[in-house]
Amino acid sequence: MSVFIDKNTKVMVQGITGSTALFHTKQMLDYGTQIVAGVTPGKGGQVVEGVPVYNTVEEAKNETGANVSVVYVPAPFAADSIIEAADADLDMVICITEHIPVVDMVKVKRYLQGRKTRLVGPNCPGVITADECKIGIMPGYIHKKGHVGVVSRSGTLTYEAVHQLTEEGIGQTTAVGIGGDPVNGTNFIDVLKAFNEDSETKAVVMIGEIGGTAEEEAAQWIKENMNKPVIGFIGGQTAPPGKRMGHAGAIISGGKGTASEKIKTLNDCGVETADTPSEIGTTLIDAAKKAGIYEELLTIKK
């Protein structure tokens, strides 16, 4: 089992003819992802990297059976691309694009209410199910199949955590980057719920950062519902209030959203936290040993 995507997922790339999308389309194909279509208005009929290009999402879906899209469309047009994917009733749309105006995302979020399409992102690295399907911009080679789920607001910290796990012989089920913007689609609790219900996932790494209250809400949900060990890391422990730290959503405002608040809430709810990014792997190992599942997690033969 896996979460959200697997080897049977059929993917379309929105904005496929752009340079960034072309580069990552090749990377995804090399990983083994089934990319069956691309969409760029006005470029229908072209073929790039062996992938047919269509003018609309609807046409691409009808012709190829694609059920998930990944958006590499520039920020001014990305919201419309997400809405187009929702109108075509795709199962999921993963938006990589950064710098989408907050007001655009508020409209998108409202538009998606009551629809079946799940949005992951924006401003995220994507979703990868190890050794099966990679949708996004993450380095594929560090991900190896196993039993640990990863959910994160940060792209590079996801890669750091996954690399540490792999180096320790611990494989992963799925890694989900939910993005660093203040208004996004899928949240921590959505992913934790999916991991909790997934029989292959035995433990979870959750990576948050300053700003907002998503981590505190997730901590409470973990305390009340989670039946698997979860460890956490919060980025931005030295951030001054009022200064945006990289991501649009990573800002301490009105005294809320500090790293220390988040870490305290996680710890109070039974989630062990790593003090530094380099300790994420060892923190997970400690939690796994306490839960008696460490041996089960050693899925990578060295």
UniProtKB/Swiss-Prot annotation:
Ranges in a coiled coil: none
Listed GO biological process terms: tricarboxylic acid cycle
Pathway given in the UniProt record: Carbohydrate metabolism; tricarboxylic acid cycle; succinate from succinyl-CoA (ligase route): step 1/1
Origin: domain of life: Bacteria
GO molecular function, one term: nucleotide binding
Keywords: Ligase, Nucleotide-binding, Tricarboxylic acid cycle
Binding site for substrate: 159
Reactions mediated catalytically: succinate + ATP + CoA = succinyl-CoA + ADP + phosphate; GTP + succinate + CoA = succinyl-CoA + GDP + phosphate
Assigned EC number: 6.2.1.5
Subunit structure: Heterotetramer of two alpha and two beta subunits.
Descriptive protein name: Succinate--CoA ligase [ADP-forming] subunit alpha
Biological source species: Staphylococcus epidermidis (strain ATCC 12228 / FDA PCI 1200)
